[in-house]
């Protein structure tokens, strides 16, 4: 410390003032944060796009962003009813226009009446607009077959991500071996590892079983938990269903087993259910943790703590930019729930347009309303096309030597395993790169296809994967898959 002070004094005498904030003085937890979905691969993709705009010759004419689940960036059209209501809310003068259906006008008027000054530009209360929270509660009741939901247990949020991080902030505590441990699936969505690094929590990995279509195995949960108790205090179990990046849909039997395990081991359950509308595989069905927990009866229904999350960014909506979401808490301590409300109030409120959109998602047009027919047709078209693209992706990858892809049962991604030659692995190590990062960088430079290496999500040692979204339009997806298959064959030959 004394030498650093002397260095600063000497620099000052020389007319130089050192930076207060440097890599050495900044929060070390932030330095440890990594987020592969928007990591180095994506930064290089942005550079390539800029080079193409400047006329630099490349082996491709466009960069295809298959790295992120951003449906509308990939060309998916917004749901008409949602945009009509939003337009009316943003510019209420349109309420007198004959170009908008009456049910859209009624919905917009209801939202505006709940806003301060009847304006979408006003702050809402921190937990979200009350009528929209009531709509969310009614949606959960319908989804779960009549099981009650209390609006007071629902908090609207800036996408599901913000609610997940808020919940982790409440849960992470202690020092040393008493520090909170959080069990997360591997492969995982990097939000979890990034948030845990930022909060200085202990990440506890449990591995999904790739040989059984990414099944969640209770024996593996128990292994991870027992080993973790030597270095931390495991208090939280995170489950992503349907899975990201793995695309599996958990069975009801599996969910029941997870709930029993969490109850027996004293773990708070976090259920990331943002892909609940994205289920494609025959025989697969989404079961909410809230529904299963309640139907299991006491003591689980009355004692097991649960937070479940949903979002407007995924599903058939794909409204990522509006940042709308919610969390529902079950069996949370009443005093802790007050602390949660306090923590959310520091952020003032979630974006009000995102709240409005969440309200539309959970309360879409009904069969008796004029917008229903178009809404239903648009919704079914999106989901049917996603199902077809999921099947095509699995089929093309599994026909390619050296690539193996589990069924894409749900969500928006495939996560194929790729075989990489030893020379390629050695070359990657020489460059200081993970082997699948090296593969993905080479793929990007040669084809313009941007995917995320499996090492950014976590994977079993000695295996290599990449995550690719199934969102591109069907004609572009076919070309993308063929290019990927051809490139892998060429890459394998080059390094054999």
Curated annotation (Swiss-Prot):
Positions carrying N6-(pyridoxal phosphate)lysine: 314
SUPFAM superfamilies: PLP-dependent transferases (SSF53383)
Stored InterPro entries: ALAT1/2-like, Aminotransferase_I/II_large, PyrdxlP-dep_Trfase, PyrdxlP-dep_Trfase_major, PyrdxlP-dep_Trfase_small
Predominant cellular place of this UniProt entry's protein: cytoplasm
Annotated Gene Ontology cellular component terms: cytoplasm; extracellular space
Modified-residue entries (N-acetylalanine), positions: 2
Pathway: Amino-acid degradation; L-alanine degradation via transaminase pathway; pyruvate from L-alanine: step 1/1
Modified residues (Phosphothreonine): 22
Cofactor(s) needed by this chain: pyridoxal 5'-phosphate
Reactions catalysed: L-alanine + 2-oxoglutarate = pyruvate + L-glutamate
SS bonds (residue pairs): none
Subunit structure: Homodimer.
Family under the similarity heading: Belongs to the class-I pyridoxal-phosphate-dependent aminotransferase family. Alanine aminotransferase subfamily.
Protein name (record): Alanine aminotransferase 1
Lineage: Eukaryota, Metazoa, Chordata, Craniata, Vertebrata
């Amino acid at each position: 410390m004394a030498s650093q002070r002397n260095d600063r004094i000497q620099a000052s005498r020389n007319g130089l003032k050192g930076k207060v904030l440097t890599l050495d003085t900044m929060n070390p937890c932030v330095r440890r944060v990594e987020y592969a979905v928007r990591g180095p691969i994506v930064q290089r993709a942005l550079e390539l796009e800029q080079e193409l705009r400047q006329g630099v010759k490349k082996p491709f004419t466009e960069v295809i962003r298959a790295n992120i689940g951003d449906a509308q960036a990939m060309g998916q059209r917004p749901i008409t009813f949602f945009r009509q209501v939003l337009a009316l809310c943003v510019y209420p003068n349109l309420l007198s226009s004959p170009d908008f259906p009456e049910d859209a006008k009624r919905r917009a008027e209801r939202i505006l009446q709940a806003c301060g000054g009847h304006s979408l530009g006003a702050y809402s209360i921190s937990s979200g607009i009350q009528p929209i929270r009531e709509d969310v509660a009614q949606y959960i009741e319908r989804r779960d077959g009549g099981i009650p939901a209390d609006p007071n247990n629902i908090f609207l949020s800036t996408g599901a991500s913000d609610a997940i991080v808020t919940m982790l902030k409440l849960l992470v505590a202690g020092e040393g071996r008493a520090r909170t441990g959080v069990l997360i699936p591997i492969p995982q969505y990097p939000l979890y590892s990034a948030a845990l690094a930022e909060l200085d929590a202990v990440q506890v990995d449990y591995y999904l079983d790739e040989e059984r279509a990414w099944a969640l195995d209770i024996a593996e949960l128990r292994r991870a938990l027992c080993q973790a108790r030597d270095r931390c205090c495991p208090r939280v179990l995170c489950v992503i269903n349907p899975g990201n990046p793995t695309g599996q849909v958990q069975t009801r039997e599996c969910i029941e087993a997870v709930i029993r395990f969490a109850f027996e081991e004293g773990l708070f359950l976090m259920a990331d259910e943002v892909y609940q509308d994205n289920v494609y595989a025959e025989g697969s069905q989404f079961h909410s943790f809230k529904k299963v927990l309640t139907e299991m009866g006491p003591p689980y229904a009355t004692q097991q703590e649960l937070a479940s999350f949903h979002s407007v960014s995924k599903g058939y909506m794909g409204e990522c930019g509006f940042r709308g979401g919610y969390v529902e808490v079950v069996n949370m301590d009443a005093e802790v729930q007050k602390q949660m409300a306090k923590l959310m109030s520091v952020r003032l409120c979630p974006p009000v347009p995102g709240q409005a959109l969440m309200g539309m998602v959970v309360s879409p047009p009904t069969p008796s309303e004029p917008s229903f027919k178009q809404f239903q047709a648009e919704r079914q078209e999106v989901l049917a096309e996603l199902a077809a693209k999921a099947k095509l992706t699995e089929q093309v990858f599994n026909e390619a030597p050296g690539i193996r892809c589990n069924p894409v049962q749900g969500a928006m991604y495939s996560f194929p395993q790729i075989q990489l030659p030893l020379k390629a692995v050695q070359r990657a190590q020489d460059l200081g790169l993970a082997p699948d990062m090296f593969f993905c960088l080479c793929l990007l430079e040669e084809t313009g296809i941007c995917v995320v290496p499996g090492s950014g999500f976590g994977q079993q040692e000695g295996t290599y994967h990449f995550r690719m979204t199934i969102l591109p339009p069907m004609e572009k997806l076919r070309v993308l898959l063929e290019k990927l298959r051809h490139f892998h064959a060429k890459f394998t030959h080059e390094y054999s």
